[in-house]
């Protein structure tokens, strides 16, 4: 059986999930405080710096529009996530991290056993498997649904069930953007960017940075779409 415990990418996902969990715990006591918003804004700022590193690759108008578009949803999504109350913040954390960790875990354990060599997104993210995608989404939705069931908040919070699927969409858009610019992953950008060198002191090398930034991107994408849904449906939050 595949040794998940020794897989670096899985460890990165777990570390990212735990980090966001710790951020949520900090928010439990300081959610409206300036330090909490600074921490969250720092993650978003790192992602924006990463995005503008893409300009070194190509300068076509289409690529610039893509970067500006993702920068827009990074800003909107981060503002939304930073302003929601703690209860809804937890929904987003459960949805995004639940999908990411379990999609990777189930993909490694069961990937290819049912759908063989077939891949759901071969031209965007060839390593994703049907098994991992389905089970990751199911786990994410289940975690959010359990929380809603306990709080009996389905009627007002139903849109947060989309946190996992939206995280997948954000991840795919990020993968598309990287392919468009000929970048394999966030690590490649960060290794070449001196701005991120100091992070190696805290996360033990460059392997973890891409994981952090990708999760911020997914969270921001999720936040942006949820904000649009809430504004359109006039649901209070």
Residue positions per predicted region:
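Juxtamembrane helix-loop transition sites at the ends of transmembrane segments
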Residues: 34, 153, 192, 235-236
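Short, hydrophobic transmembrane alpha-helix segments
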Residues: 24-37, 54
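Juxtamembrane boundary at the C-terminal end of a transmembrane helix
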Residues: 228-237
């Amino acid at each position: 059986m595949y040794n998940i415990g020794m897989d670096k990418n899985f460890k990165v996902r777990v570390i990212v999930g735990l980090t966001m969990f710790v951020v949520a715990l900090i928010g439990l006591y300081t959610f409206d405080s300036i330090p909490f918003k600074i921490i969250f804004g720092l993650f978003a700022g790192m992602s924006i710096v990463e995005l503008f590193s893409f300009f070194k690759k190509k300068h076509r108008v289409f690529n610039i529009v893509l970067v500006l578009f993702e920068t827009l949803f990074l800003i909107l999504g981060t503002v939304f996530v930073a302003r929601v109350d703690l209860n809804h913040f937890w929904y987003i954390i459960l949805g995004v991290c639940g999908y990411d960790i379990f999609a990777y875990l189930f993909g490694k354990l069961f990937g290819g056993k049912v759908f063989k060599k077939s891949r759901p997104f071969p031209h965007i993210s060839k390593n994703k498997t049907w098994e991992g995608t389905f089970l990751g989404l199911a786990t994410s939705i289940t975690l959010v649904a359990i929380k809603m069931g306990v709080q009996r908040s389905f009627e007002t919070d139903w849109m947060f069930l989309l946190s996992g699927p939206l995280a997948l969409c954000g991840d795919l858009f990020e993968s598309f953007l990287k392919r468009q610019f000929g970048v394999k992953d966030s690590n490649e950008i960060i290794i070449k960017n001196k701005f991120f060198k100091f992070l190696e002191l805290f996360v033990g090398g460059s392997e973890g940075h891409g994981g952090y930034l990708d999760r911020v991107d997914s969270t921001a994408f999720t936040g942006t779409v949820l904000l649009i849904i809430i504004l359109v449906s006039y649901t209070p939050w």
